[in-house]
Regions:
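A short, low-complexity linker immediately N-terminal to eukaryotic Hanks-type protein kinase catalytic domains
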Residues: 4-17
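ATP-binding glycine-rich loop module of kinase domains
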Residues: 19-21, 25-124
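C-lobe/activation-segment region of protein kinase-like
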Residues: 175-189, 197-204, 213-291
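Protein kinase-like catalytic core scaffold
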Residues: 37, 132, 157, 219-222
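Feature marks short, surface-exposed loop/turn motifs that line or immediately flank catalytic pockets
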Residues: 45, 165, 227
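Conserved protein-kinase catalytic-loop position immediately C-terminal to the HRD catalytic Asp
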Residues: 209-210
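Conserved structural core of kinase catalytic domains
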Residues: 80-186
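Anionic group-transfer/hydrolysis microenvironments
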Residues: 42, 162, 224
Length: 291
């Protein structure tokens, strides 16, 4: 068993005492929760391909529509995406996977699959048992009830449920006018990223919804974007330099609309810290690239 994982003799009682609520979903998994724990259902390859097709279509549609109509399409409307996936599923299944794999969609699926597997491996190796990730427990396989399809799952591991995503915390603080606290959480986020670099890990998908809040800590929720491959890190940093205002790229434009001073301070700190020199200052010496 990897270091940092807790092996329990049986599953936490709350996982089996009632039906687990559907908490959220991503490209590769669906998450269900009890009061203190979450479990995950991995999507089938055909589900992931269907979602990739849908997102490609939505992005094309968003580009030709006026901004006020196109942008909402890309804000992850979960129920609509679910419906579209169900409608797309027969088309995906009818076409052999070998055909899909020869297309750009197949290439995107392979990239997603390899990055997700690599990220999970890196998280198990370097982050398990640390304060950078929620607690993770394993136990003998047990059948649990879940809301919606398929109605039940067999699970053998669970992860500590966080209070909310980092994005949701920032959104709530902005809505209530607590901008001093919002800025403090942004500082914690930047400190969290630097702590990850000290362990030789960089996230190429550092969206605020991929991070959670528990107590006064920021934790990583989705390890799929983790990499220790320096050329990939440099490519990502290069793209970020030309991507515009960091706070807008992270989805905080609407949250900081009335506080351009906070947006400007965050953007300045981000550009200083999340840069080649900034990352190198924290990167472990034994794996640091030649400059």
């Amino acid at each position: 068993m990897p270091a940092g994982l807790h092996l329990l003799p049986r599953a936490p009682a709350e996982l089996t005492s009632g039906r687990l609520r559907r908490l959220g979903e991503g490209v590769g998994k669906v998450v269900y929760c009890s009061e203190h724990w979450v479990v995950k259902r991995q999507r089938r390859a055909s589900d992931i391909i269907a979602l990739i097709v849908i997102w490609k279509l939505l992005r094309r549609l968003a580009r030709i529509l006026p901004a006020h109509m196109g942008e909402p399409l890309l804000q992850r409307p979960s129920k609509w995406i679910r419906l579209l996936r169900v409608m797309m599923q027969p088309v995906v299944v009818a076409i052999p996977r070998s055909v899909w794999l020869t297309t750009h969609i197949g290439q995107l699926w392979r990239v997603y699959h390899s990055r997700d597997a690599r990220g999970e491996r890196l998280a198990r190796t370097y982050l398990a048992g640390t304060s950078l990730v929620p607690e993770h427990v394993t136990f003998p396989p047990v059948r649990v009830k879940v809301g919606g399809w398929p109605g039940w799952l067999t699970v053998s591991e669970a992860t500590e449920r966080v209070e909310c995503t980092l994005y949701q915390r920032l959104k709530d603080l902005a809505a209530s006018g607590r901008f001093d606290q919002l800025e403090a959480w942004l500082d914690r986020f930047l400190e969290f990223r630097q702590t990850g670099w000290q362990r030789g890990l960089f996230s190429v998908d550092a969206h605020l919804k991929n991070f959670g809040v528990t107590g006064d800590r920021v934790v990583l929720l989705d390890a799929g974007g983790l990499t220790d491959h320096w050329p990939e890190i440099e490519r990502r940093l290069s793209v970020q330099e030309d991507a515009g205002e960091p706070h807008s790229q992270l989805g905080m434009g609407p949250l900081l609309l009335d506080r351009p001073d906070i947006a400007a301070r965050f953007d300045a700190r981000w550009k200083e810290i999340v840069s080649r020199d900034g990352v190198l200052r924290h990167w472990p010496g034994e794996t640091k690239p030649q400059t």
